[in-house]
Amino acid sequence: QVLANVYSVKSGKPLFAPYHIIDKQITATGPDGKAITSTVKVGIISFAPPTIMAWDKRWLEGRVYTQGVRETAEKFIPEMRARGAELVVAISHGGLDDSPYSPTMENGNYYLSQVPGVDAMLIGHSHQLFPNAASTVPQFNLPGVDKARGMVNGVPTVMANLWGKHLGVIGLRLRHDGKQWVVDKSATTVEARGIQNADKSYVQPDPAIAKLVAEEHAA
């Protein structure tokens, strides 16, 4: 459970852990062409839309306060890198908007993508599908947004529509620069996979995931 930009009024500290760094085992091809296994340190950081303070004022006012997405990322991502994160994935409940930046803006991810050190973004809130080459929504035609490849200012980004209709998948292609693993953006893929086939039948559920969510589905 991570949330970087919501703070406790009482303590002045983030309400939850702002980020977490996990070790992921990968299989790669070594310089000699042979398969090797390696560990990649992946940092995960998340953000809520600061406008929760207006939407849920009756419950939140006097208890918590928010910081802007951009300045929060600028604070914690260097710290994550200093603690060994080779990759940083930002999970942000917001969409894209190129209005002048404000710490209270609802959809601040266009600016989040410009913070150095963000390797991938999982975004949402505006209930749209990204990447989507056919989309005509203005925010997917902003400068630096590649709606076909799923890039926002060069950062691989996915928005998986709404109500579980799609599964957002970012396939980060990694290479080792001699010191650590880095993202090869030219070979990275982004897609939002629909849960329905062309004939309107549904894809088969993943057994492991189905087991994890069975109780919630039955509720």
Where are these regions (language model features)?
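Non-catalytic terminal accessory segments
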Residues: 81-83, 180-182, 190-219
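Acidic, metal/ion-coordinating pockets
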Residues: 1-194
